[in-house]
Amino acid sequence: MDKNVIEVKQLSKSFRKTVALQGCDFSVRKGEIFGFLGPSGAGKTTTIKLLTGQLKSDGGDIQILGEKPFSSKIKSQIGIMSDNSGLYEKMSVYDNLLLFAKIYDIDKSCIEKVLEEVDLLDAKKQLVSQLSKGMKQRLIFARTIIHSPSLLFLDEPTANLDPSTANEVREIIKKLNAKGTTVFLTTHNMEEADEMCHRVAFLNHGHIIESGHPEDLKLKYSKKQIRMKTSQEDYTIPLDPKLLKQELEHIDELLMIHSIEPTLKEVFLTLTKEES
């Protein structure tokens, strides 16, 4: 997982007088799930459109699998997940994928294989209009990976999904990655990124403010806390042996005590506070 499949240097993009990205540098290693994190308007979707050739940058350099993002040489090697607007509601699950098999000029024998990967094989004859939201989302994934891409671009893959459907999507992403697919995803869900991503980059106001392994970032920017509950109050204190000892000496009845693990959300809040 040491070869970079995405290399970005000094990437910049503006829309009239609005700066969307400015001087962004990052790389994505082969075989990893890389998360681009930030609030709405941070520049995440703009970044993914630049990486996939849907937009042209104002400055900087992008290399995708050693090529420019709009190169025809890499078209068959990447998958881009979009919303369900491309699904044909009055056609069957199988026929929806048959259309994409024809677009990529691949044998239709791959359809049942990819349906099995996303657990939709038993629904292949159903109309898309009859599918649940979760099943539609899995069909979108099937459409995205039908040509067996080595690199996936996913823009907010679980946004606006209920918890059960979002979990289904995360499991598919992890399963694809376990088979060797590199994944670049954008999300504002810090917990989701912590669960799935090997590395993350925090984006704020068009700038990358920090990047690294989630555990390393939490260790660097967050402090563990202790939650204590007594008969009178429920509160937290920093994980400090001396402070903890002092607290315990003054407590008559301790009902509960446990450590609170740091989160990526805390890291982001710390970083943005330092930036301001």
Predicted regions and their residues:
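Catalytic Walker B motif of ABC-type/P-loop ATPase nucleotide-binding domains
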Residues: 152-156
